[in-house]
Amino acid sequence: MTNLRKTHPLLKIINHSFIDLPAPSNISAWWNFGSLLGICLIIQILTGLFLAMHYTSDTLTAFSSVAHICRDVNHGWFLRNLHANGASMFFMCLFLHVGRGIYYGSYLYKETWNIGVILLLTVMATAFVGYVLPWGQMSFWGATVITNLLSAIPYIGTTLAEWIWGGFAVDKATLTRFFAFHFILPFIITALAIVHLLFLHETGSNNPSGINPNSDKIPFHPYYTIKDALGLMLLLLVLLILALFSPDLLGDPDNFSPANPLNTPPHIKPEWYFLFAYAILRSIPNKLGGVLALLASILILLIIPLLHTANQRSMMFRPISQTLFWILTANLITLTWIGGQPVEQPFIIIGQLASMLYFLLILVLMPTAGLFENYMLKPKW
């Protein structure tokens, strides 16, 4: 008798995705982040659902309702800390997942990669609208500054900004719709993640060598289920340490003050995971130029497959490209640091140089390195 998991219409899909899936035998821990992102999404949806049961999306009561969750709801403080720090873990895994894709040439699975970039943008949008909900000072002013960027769009900008606000400034209507967006977007992310997996399973996983692994595959279960379980334990350990011991480490102290439209905080800045893009935005002294650079800093990921010039897929055996990749990583860390600093020298010039280097590395230096490595591989005699 055939096993039920191989014949049942629903179980068959699960079986082909997580049990009998043929996986390359040599994929490293860098391939753990896909499953970790799935776990992060589940944690965020569950904690978010319970928080939404007690939250009120009204300007007069939003801040108080968050305080009420932390003080009066059973384990409400824990749910809130898990949700806030879960977002940080989500982005940490996202950045490592994208970095892995760039390093090992996974972007050559174009459909999977493009859906992944759309996923990244959707998660960023979700995190942004979510940050506004507690209605603290940084929530309010962050929303004001970022939504104001829409007004830089020629001709329709101001109308567009007012349409998003539901009035002439960030107010009650904005908070209500942001709560609605924050509730619906994770389910859209879940649907996109399923499509992402669907396209990935059309081709199968890439592997560190970048060579076609079809001749050497092993079943996903038990080999990679146990490997993913280890990653999950480490993720939960870090998340619990953050949520239980220093829940406010990655937050902004200004958000402990209720939103006040009459008092601007000295340094308006988003959460740490947006700082690299915020630094690129601020490094251009023109509003529209800054907005375009901000968009380009993320959308540039879409053209990475077109910029692949090397004969080898992975960077595993390409030392020059490796060096440039780690310079890019250091550059992004520098941009993250600059995004959190005030707009004054020497931070302005460092931010401008780092922003320039970011685009230069991706658009010019890395494709050139690929061509040079091709030349070096050719026999010279």
Swiss-Prot record:
Keywords: Electron transport, Heme, Iron, Membrane, Metal-binding, Mitochondrion, Mitochondrion inner membrane, Respiratory chain, Transmembrane, Transmembrane helix, Transport, Ubiquinone. A ubiquinone binds at H201. Its cofactor is heme b. Its main location: mitochondrion. PANTHER family: CYTOCHROME B. GO terms for cellular component: mitochondrial inner membrane; respiratory chain complex III. Binds 2 heme b groups non-covalently. CDD domains: cytochrome_b_C, Cytochrome_b_N. Heme 1 (or BL or b562) is low-potential and absorbs at about 562 nm, and heme 2 (or BH or b566) is high-potential and absorbs at about 566 nm. The cytochrome bc1 complex contains 11 subunits: 3 respiratory subunits (MT-CYB, CYC1 and UQCRFS1), 2 core proteins (UQCRC1 and UQCRC2) and 6 low-molecular weight proteins (UQCRH/QCR6, UQCRB/QCR7, UQCRQ/QCR8, UQCR10/QCR9, UQCR11/QCR10 and a cleavage product of UQCRFS1). This cytochrome bc1 complex then forms a dimer. Pfam families: Cytochrom_B_C (PF00032), Cytochrome_B (PF00033). It is a multi-pass membrane protein. The keyword Membrane applies. Belongs to the cytochrome b family. One of its GO terms (molecular function) is ubiquinol-cytochrome-c reductase activity. It is found in: Mitochondrion inner membrane. The keyword Heme applies. This is Cytochrome b. It comes from Pseudantechinus woolleyae (Woolley's false antechinus).
